[in-house]
Amino acid sequence: MVEPLKIGVLLSGSGTNLQAIIDAAGEGLPVDIVRVVSSRPDAYGIERARAAGIPATVLNRGVYADPEAADARIVAELREAGAEYVVMAGYMRKVTPVMLEAFPDRVDRKSVV
């Protein structure tokens, strides 16, 4: 049996990408979504996460002094949850080196470019 990958999901909107991952996991994809972090409090993806029993956090970068501080907080949330990989599922913010260095080669970088 394959150990599931523990993933954290970052999102900013409706969460359709998150839902696709949730559905695929239900059909046998070996992933365990350990935390969802949203950049917006009104993102419907938060509701999708909670409906699936996945802990969800809203982290508004506006309350942090700089983007690096915000990413450091996101990294702390993901590490606390045990995330090994990060999936950017419609995340509409640029990530800083803080995030990329915390999860080297473990961030879905296609969304970063």
For the regions a protein language model found, what residue spans apply to each?
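One-carbon transfer enzymes
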Residues: 1-113
